[in-house]
UniProtKB/Swiss-Prot annotation:
This is Chitin synthase 2. The chain crosses the membrane at residues 663-683, 703-723, 738-758, 780-800, 907-927, 931-951. It is an enzyme of class 2 (transferase). It catalyses: [(1->4)-N-acetyl-beta-D-glucosaminyl](n) + UDP-N-acetyl-alpha-D-glucosamine = [(1->4)-N-acetyl-beta-D-glucosaminyl](n+1) + UDP + H(+). Its EC number is 2.4.1.16. It comes from Paracoccidioides brasiliensis. Pfam families: Chitin_synth_1, Chitin_synth_1N, Glyco_trans_2_3. The keyword Cell membrane applies. GO terms for biological process: cell wall organization; chitin biosynthetic process. It is found in: Cell membrane. CDD domains: Chitin_synth_C. The keyword Membrane applies. The gene is CHS2.
């Protein structure tokens, strides 16, 4: 007995020492193949096994038979824990693997297999999922007959005080492969009877000492290697079961619980919108969404709310990085809305007035990793959607959930601890790919009619709005009731550390975006008509978009383009609706008996990625150029619609001035090919004169002859390439053409600078004449060119945003011939390519399953059997989102065009080419290339470009002055309201605070009036300081080169 007691004490001390090895056995990710070693003859009792870790699901685990003492015990030597590999005994030590003990024949899944809480979150009181029995492992020995049942407790040894994943009394292992460890323990316990019998044989004694090279090895055969796709380790496959579900108004609507892991770290769980995801299978057209009785959460129950801001995010096949960049930017904007506690509209519950609608264009097209990101936020669950409901095909799958977490572009969770507020999300995944215009029809005609919002904001996936962008867009509508649409400032993404500027394409587009936001958009905003509100970041007043009683209006004209695709539409109308947002802008301004205007909001900034390869760049600009050209023609033809509006006389005059400016710009666009050739012909040809030749020996003449014929042949080659090739198929030829255009442009610039230097080096008698304004080279080249480039610099400095002039202007001017020739030729040669739909998308798929009707109000469908299956799907989505893998690109088949559109394309290209050719030949014959100072046409072209630049600069300056005056007047009104009489201040507070308090708008007197005045002054000064701080921050950001 004394010997047994000492053995038991020794066993206890060993087990205390070996707690960390036991913990390592459970948490190791990949256990190495284990070898079965015999047991030592001198084993102690098993009475001192470590106690079990507290279960994560109290009260739900099955009862296990208590431990039975045997004559053998586990004797584990003390060792250190390796974070990367299991422990291996040294050759100089004597070690024996001890007999594992058998357990009950029924084993259960551990509670941590599918519902491990998020690391670092308070979830110690959370109960786990119900557990299922595990199947017996398949081994090479027959089943063992256990004499008794033994329970093996697994303890978490060691000090966990410094472990970042210890929460309360529970240790959470981040991404621990629990399933592999549990299988190892079960396999060892299954072998215990065989090891007990082998223990008595003499050969099972294993001693490892220095002089012994051979070691006895007992290899376990696990069977042949598996073939095919294997399940992810640590994640079980969700099991589906058939259930009967009651229909709501004949339609399938499901309320699904969110995964337990997500539920465990939510700060708010007090409402069903936080704990359940709502799925609706929409079987009707978007125009009939409300007519058929479909409702959203904002229309029913405790979540019935008014929607002030409705955000639309359109998505095609973008990856999870682009999606999270946009979605996380929206979540930050919602946090800014909620931080404006003094606002009469917003506040800490301002998120209840904002709804974000994500529309995926085609279930087969959406990126699977983007779905994983949505699933990680709780918005999407796999296995819920169905293809057919009640014998009706499903057109869209609508998921609704109020998420409280966000994923940043690094795929890291951000929650309330980072200031993230709840966000009402509607995820509409269309069954078929029907293009972006149809997605907007779902947004405006289906969900917009159900919510009836005040302001609608349109975003593209990939656009990252700055934290205050959406607020400034909304504020433009709140301050002016005549504003029907607003455009934000789109800036080109320059990559990490501005490394994208080393790509000439990215740099040139950065310059183009900047100058458009400095010159073009402010000019059009002063007139009240912006030709295009960018779909990447724009906003509309929903009331202004509605049609009149006869069914005609902006939305009817906007969606007319979707009805025309695939029908007998002429080429002009089809190309015009390639830029349908331009048609929408025109219809808003020209709406009958209304006086709507469009506004540019420069403080609303969004960053978007721009094409960085030649094929992608050309394909994008093809649609932009064709749509812009034909939409401009449409607005100029129908300019008389302005007369039927309720605009003031001053506004109508300004709009007609803008129409004249657009007509001149359109004419220069049409003849841009000839004007480029003539400019090169006269400026570069001037160096062919032997008296001016900088190289001597007529080298300048030979260079000009080579470049001249090269330019002509290259233009002809562009037509050949554009008529029968796509940029993706002939990328090298398109790229080589752009390089040759750059060489021609650089020689032209060199020629212009050399002639100016020669003019300045003339004799003293000729200096006065050469530098005077008139018909001379100095006037034509220097004054006109510097007036254009100089205005670019002046306006950039005026807007405190000049860095693009130093980093991107050279690349832009070098690629300017490619903009004029390459892009314009390709666009006009592909006017026949107007198809938007995808052929074959009308096939009804059944890969998701169908909901078969069983009675008049119930259907039978397959769903995840219980909470454990929902959790497993969430675990798999989270694990896949955390890995870095690429989704294979889908091939896009070449669209077939009708013969009629091809014929019209031929006629149009022929007319355009012949008109430019006649102009180039006539002017080149009328004027010689050696007489630049007396060339009237060159003077007309250069001075026209300079005049248009001056006109844009005047309009942009007026826009800046109006903004400054508006801010001064706004600040003066706030100061006057805060420093006026008690009545004036009280009324102002009553309107600004949203009616908070019964004393709003009541005259105060005496000490109460002084107290109210002091308090009001403090609040207004605080608001003014906050607004000034944001303005200073934006201005300082513009002055930084790396912005």
């Amino acid at each position: 007995m004394a010997q047994e007691s000492s053995n038991m004490d020794q066993s206890k001390s060993d087990n205390v020492t070996d707690n960390k090895p036991n913990r390592s056995l459970i948490s190791m990710a990949r256990p190495s193949p284990q070898r079965c070693h015999p047991l030592d003859q001198q084993s102690a009792s098993t009475s001192s096994l470590p106690t079990s870790r507290p279960s994560s699901s109290p009260g739900q685990s099955p009862n296990i038979t208590p431990s039975i003492l045997t004559s053998d015990t586990l004797h584990l030597p003390a060792r250190s824990v390796s974070p990367t590999r299991p422990w291996t005994p040294s050759r100089g030590s004597e070690w024996s693997r001890h007999m594992p003990l058998s357990v009950s024949s029924v084993n259960y899944e551990p509670p941590e297999i599918n519902c491990s809480p998020r690391p670092g979150t308070p979830s110690s009181k959370y109960g786990g999922s119900p557990r299922r029995p595990l199947r017996q492992p398949v081994v090479c020995w027959p089943p063992a007959s256990s004499a008794g049942e033994t329970s093996i407790d697994i303890a978490d040894g060691g000090d966990d005080s410094e472990d970042p994943f210890v929460v309360g009394e529970r240790t959470v292992h981040q991404r621990s492969n629990t399933r592999s460890s549990i299988k190892l323990i079960q396999f060892t316990m299954q072998l215990s009877p065989q090891l007990l019998q082998m223990k008595r044989t003499p050969w099972v004694k294993l001693t490892l000492d220095d002089g012994e090279d051979d070691e006895s090895d007992f290899n376990v055969h696990y069977g042949p290697a598996p073939t095919g796709r294997q399940e992810r380790r640590g994640v079980r496959k969700a099991q589906m079961t058939k259930k009967e579900v009651r229909l709501m108004n004949g339609e399938l609507v499901l309320e699904c619980k969110i995964p337990r892991m997500l539920h465990s770290f939510l700060p708010r769980r007090d409402d069903r919108e936080f704990t359940h995801m709502r799925y609706t299978a929409v079987t009707c057209d978007p125009d009939d969404f409300t007519v058929k009785g479909f409702k959203l959460r904002q229309n029913i129950g405790s979540t019935m709310r008014e929607t002030e801001l409705f955000v639309c995010v359109t998505m095609y096949n973008e990856n999870e990085i682009d999606f999270t960049r946009t979605m996380h930017g929206i979540m930050r904007n919602i946090s800014h809305f909620c931080s404006r506690t003094k606002s009469r509209t917003w506040g800490k519950d301002g998120w209840q007035k904002i709804v974000v609608c994500i529309i995926a264009d085609g279930r087969q097209k959406v990126h699977p990793r983007t779905l994983n990101a949505l699933a990680a936020m709780g918005v999407y669950q796999d296995g819920i959607a169905k293809n057919v409901v009640n014998q009706k095909p499903v057109n869209a799958h609508v998921y609704e959930y109020t998420t409280q977490v966000s994923l940043d572009p690094d795929l890291k969770f951000k929650g309330a601890e980072k200031g993230i507020m709840p966000c009402q999300v509607i995820f509409c995944m269309k069954e078929r790919n029907e293009k972006k215009l149809n997605s907007h029809r779902w947004f405006f005609n289906a969900f917009g009619r159900a919510l009836n919002p005040n302001i609608c904001i349109l975003l593209d996936v990939g656009t990252k709005p700055e934290p205050t962008a959406l607020y400034h867009l909304w504020k433009a509508f709140d301050q002016d009731s005549n504003v029907a649409g607003a455009a934000g400032e789109i800036k080109a993404g320059k990559g990490k550390g501005c490394l994208g500027l080393f790509n000439p394409l990215v740099a040139s587009q950065n310059f183009e975006y900047k100058m458009s936001n400095i010159l073009d958009k402010p000019l059009e905003s002063v007139f009240g008509y912006i030709t295009v509100l960018p779909g990447a970041l724009s906003a509309y007043r929903y009331h202004a978009l509605q049609n009149d009683s006869t069914g005609h209006g902006p939305l009817s004209m906007y969606f007319k383009g979707e009805m025309l695709h695939g029908k007998n539409a002429d080429v002009f109308t089809a190309n015009m609706y390639l830029a349908e947002d331009r048609i929408l802008c025109w219809e808003l301004v020209a709406k009958r008996e209304e006086q709507w205007v469009l506004k540019f909001v420069k403080s609303a900034v969004g960053e978007t990625d721009v094409p960085d390869t030649v094929p992608e760049f050309i394909s994008q600009r093809r649609r932009w150029l064709n749509g812009a050209f034909f939409a401009a023609v449409y607005s100029l033809i129908h300019f008389r619609q302005i007369w039927r509006t309720d605009h003031t006389i001053t506004r109508k005059i300004l709009l007609h001035i803008e129409f004249l400016y657009q007509f001149v710009s359109l004419a220069f666009t049409f003849f841009s090919l000839a004007n480029f050739y003539l400019t090169f012909y006269f400026i570069a040809g001037a160096l062919s004169d032997p008296t001016v030749d900088p190289f001597g020996h007529n080298i300048g003449k030979y260079i000009f002859a080579i470049l001249r014929y090269t330019c002509v042949l290259l233009i002809c080659l562009q037509f050949v390439l554009s008529m029968g090739n796509r940029p993706q198929g002939a990328k090298k030829m398109f790229l080589s053409g752009m390089i040759i255009y750059c060489i021609i442009m650089m020689y032209t610039v060199f020629s212009a600078l050399y002639m100016v230097v020669m003019q300045l080096k003339t004799s003293k008698e000729m200096i006065k004449d050469s530098l005077s304004l008139g018909n001379n080279t100095f006037t034509y080249i220097i004054v006109s060119t510097l007036s254009t480039v100089g205005l670019y610099f002046f306006m950039s400095f005026l807007y405190l945003d000049p860095w693009h002039m130093f980093t991107s202007s050279i690349q832009y001017f070098a690629l300017l011939p490619s903009y004029i020739c390459r892009l314009q030729i390709y666009a006009f040669c592909n006017t026949h390519d107007v198809t938007w739909g995808t052929k074959g998308d009308n096939v009804i798929r059944t890969d998701l399953g169908t909901a078969r009707i069983t009675s008049s109000s119930t259907v039978e469908l397959e769903m995840p059997s219980e909470q454990l299956d929902i959790d497993s799907g969430y675990d798999e989505s989270s694990a896949i989102s955390a890995t870095d893998s690429k989704c294979p690109r889908q091939s896009h088949p070449r669209r077939r065009c009708r013969k009629t559109t091809t014929a019209v394309r031929t006629y149009m290209v022929s007319v355009w080419f012949i008109a430019n050719a006649i102009l180039a030949m006539a002017v080149s014959e009328a004027f010689t290339e050696k007489s630049v100072g007396n060339n009237a046409y060159l003077a007309f072209v250069l001075w026209s470009v300079a005049s248009l630049a001056v006109f844009r600069a005047v309009g942009s300056t007026a826009f800046a002055i109006l903004n400054v005056v508006h801010r001064v007047m706004e600040g003066k009104m706030k100061f006057a309201a805060a420093g006026g009489t008690g009545y004036g201040y009280g009324s102002y507070v009553g309107s600004s605070s949203g009616g908070g308090g019964g004393s709003s708008g009541v005259r105060s007197s005496g000490a109460g009036s002084s107290l109210g005045l002091s308090s009001g002054m403090g609040e207004k000064v605080s608001d003014w300081a906050s607004e000034t701080g944001w303005a200073v921050k934006r201005t300082a950001g513009k002055l930084r080169f790396w912005r």
